[in-house]
Amino acid sequence: MAITTRQYFQLIQDTAASVTRSHANWTSFLRTVARLYPYRFPDQLAIHAQRPDATACTSYDKWNEQHHRYVKRGSKGIALLDDSQATPRLRYVFDVSDTASPQQLPAPQPWTVQESQHADLGQALEASYFIPVGYGLVPQLEALAVQAALDYWSNFRYDILGIVDGSMLEEYDEAEVGALFTQALSASVA
């Protein structure tokens, strides 16, 4: 049974509250969105709520026309909000596990970085972000995540401090909130 727009908004609200309730929930959400990076945050919440195991999602038409795959009969679509019109409505996407290929083509795979690409990627990151390659790609990416979190805190500190009231962080001073925020954000990004 398809959900209504009202049910969709409730689902997003409930999911946002759930993923921020515990470290395990947040980690589970991050595992889902790591595979679904092209989608906006509300869409990522919706996909996680309806199919946390989803790996590659797109519309029925794109599966047919661009990927030469068909959506299997009986597959349940994942509802996402289409707010491109004056009245928001729901649109549906399907995970690759809901598809098959009439020509027996392999399913599209998410991109990965091969070991042989680490050196080139590390050099490109060093040239762009001035973070030395050092001990390898993983520490470099972790350092980049910390740098990005510190930059974000610097740019949006007052906005973030403005929403701390009523949360468990209201007891902390600005420096402590900043440290907790940058630590959590850099861990989430890395």
Can you say where each PLM-predicted feature lies in the sequence?
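N-terminal accessory/interface modules of nucleic-acid-binding and processing proteins
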Residues: 1-190
